[in-house]
C-alpha cells in the first residue's frame, strides 16, 4: 500500500549559487559516504549535477514522508547510493517499508520522485 509520494526539482544554477555562497553547503546536504562519491568527480558540472540530484531526492523523500525537513527529519538522516547498474537507492532512511527512488538530470535541472510503500 502506498504511504506517500514526493517529487522535487531543482535548477542546477540554484545549487551552483549555493555552493558559491557557502563552502559548507555540500557538507550540510551530503553524508560522509555521499561526500566521498561527490569528491570523486573531476568536473564542477558533474559535482553540481550529483549534488542537485541528491538534494532533489532528499526533498522528495521528506514530502513523501509527510514531515518536510526539521526536528523530525534532517538531510543526514537520508543517504543515497547507486547499485552496480547505476540505479539510485536509499541506504539510510527512517521509513518502515519500501522506498522507491528515481532521479533524472538535464543540463538545466535535476528532478527526483519517491514512493514510500508500506508492506
Swiss-Prot record:
<keyword id="KW-0460">Magnesium</keyword>
<dbReference type="GO" id="GO:0000287">
    <property type="term" value="F:magnesium ion binding"/>
</dbReference>
<protein>
    <recommendedName>
        <fullName>Holo-[acyl-carrier-protein] synthase</fullName>
        <ecNumber>2.7.8.7</ecNumber>
    </recommendedName>
</protein>
<keyword id="KW-0443">Lipid metabolism</keyword>
<keyword id="KW-0479">Metal-binding</keyword>
<dbReference type="InterPro" id="IPR002582">
    <property type="entry name" value="ACPS"/>
</dbReference>
<comment type="function">
    <text>Transfers the 4'-phosphopantetheine moiety from coenzyme A to a Ser of acyl-carrier-protein.</text>
</comment>
<dbReference type="InterPro" id="IPR037143">
    <property type="entry name" value="4-PPantetheinyl_Trfase_dom_sf"/>
</dbReference>
<dbReference type="Pfam" id="PF01648">
    <property type="entry name" value="ACPS"/>
</dbReference>
<feature type="binding site">
    <location>
        <position position="59"/>
    </location>
    <ligand>
        <name>Mg(2+)</name>
    </ligand>
</feature>
<dbReference type="InterPro" id="IPR008278">
    <property type="entry name" value="4-PPantetheinyl_Trfase_dom"/>
</dbReference>
<keyword id="KW-0276">Fatty acid metabolism</keyword>
<dbReference type="GO" id="GO:0006633">
    <property type="term" value="P:fatty acid biosynthetic process"/>
</dbReference>
<keyword id="KW-0275">Fatty acid biosynthesis</keyword>
<comment type="similarity">
    <text>Belongs to the P-Pant transferase superfamily. AcpS family.</text>
</comment>
<keyword id="KW-0444">Lipid biosynthesis</keyword>
<keyword id="KW-0963">Cytoplasm</keyword>
<dbReference type="GO" id="GO:0008897">
    <property type="term" value="F:holo-[acyl-carrier-protein] synthase activity"/>
</dbReference>
<dbReference type="GO" id="GO:0005737">
    <property type="term" value="C:cytoplasm"/>
</dbReference>
<keyword id="KW-0808">Transferase</keyword>
<dbReference type="InterPro" id="IPR004568">
    <property type="entry name" value="Ppantetheine-prot_Trfase_dom"/>
</dbReference>
<feature type="binding site">
    <location>
        <position position="8"/>
    </location>
    <ligand>
        <name>Mg(2+)</name>
    </ligand>
</feature>
Amino acid at each position: 500500500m502506498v504511504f506517500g509520494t514526493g517529487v522535487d526539482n531543482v535548477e542546477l544554477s540554484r545549487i551552483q549559487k549555493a555552493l558559491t555562497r557557502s563552502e559548507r553547503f555540500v557538507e550540510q546536504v551530503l553524508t560522509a559516504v555521499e561526500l566521498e562519491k561527490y569528491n570523486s568527480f573531476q568536473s564542477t558540472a558533474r559535482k553540481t549535477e550529483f549534488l542537485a540530484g541528491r538534494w532533489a531526492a532528499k526533498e522528495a523523500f521528506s514530502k513523501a514522508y509527510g514531515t518536510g525537513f526539521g526536528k523530525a527529519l534532517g538531510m543526514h538522516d537520508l543517504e543515497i547510493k547507486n547499485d552496480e547498474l547505476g540505479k539510485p537507492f536509499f541506504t539510510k532512511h527512517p521509513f518502515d517499508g519500501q522506498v522507491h527512488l528515481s532521479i533524472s538530470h538535464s543540463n538545466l535541472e535535476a528532478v527526483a520522485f519517491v514512493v514510500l510503500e508500506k508492506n
